[in-house]
Amino acid sequence: MLTAKFDQLVKQLRILPGVGQKSAQRMALHLLTKKRPQGMALAQALDEAMRDIVECQRCHSFSDEAVCPLCQDPRRDDTLLCVVETAADVMAIEQTAGYRGRYFVLGGHLSPIDGISADDLNIEQLVWRVKQEPVEELILATGTTVEGQTTAHFISEAVSRHVNKVTRLAQGVPMGGELEYLDSMTLGQAMQNRSFL
């Protein structure tokens, strides 16, 4: 719109999730008119991240080194392994500060419609890891979508001979949630997964 370089900046900002044409233009204009030093710092941080951040060899999350800090931490419980779809899921669980085990990132979920099979995910490495390490409980923390449920079931079948306990995250009523606002599927799951007080 203004110049070819401006248009290129807008185009690249639009690759971010949730950023449309107008938002990308506003961001570009903001960086160029008011925040040039921060824009340069952003460009440098992005360049370094894209060059230096790699996939952890053990858990497949992101790391600055071959093995991420979570996998290197000797205070973590090796008997607990939490399986998630993405590195974003690792960050979400870590923010709760309630889990002290290890992680394994699948790299997505099974989705025949999208052409994603077990061969496209890190499932083979997961089975190998469970066979080699002292994992007593495998926690399946995949999404509650049909694809997430299918992925959890597939993994459960694949590792059942190698792990004592395979569990799934509880599903149901969120904290502070009102029953009348829940969809029937969520409420049904909550009824099936009720617990003792």
From Swiss-Prot:
- Domain of life, source organism: Bacteria
GO MF annotation terms: DNA binding; zinc ion binding
Q: Supply one GO BP term.
A: DNA recombination
Domain Toprim, first and last residues per copy:
79-174
Supply the InterPro entries for this chain.
DNA_Rcmb_RecR, Rcmb_RecR, Rcmb_RecR_Znf, TOPRIM_dom, TOPRIM_RecR
Coiled coil location = none
Alphabetically list the UniProt keywords: DNA damage, DNA recombination, DNA repair, Metal-binding, Zinc, Zinc-finger
Zn finger (C4-type) location: 56-71
Role played: May play a role in DNA repair. It seems to be involved in an RecBC-independent recombinational process of DNA repair. It may act with RecF and RecO.
Give the similarity note.
Belongs to the RecR family.
> HAMAP family annotated for this entry?
RecR (MF_00017)
Protein name according to UniProt: Recombination protein RecR
Specify the taxonomic lineage. Bacteria, Pseudomonadati, Pseudomonadota, Gammaproteobacteria, Moraxellales
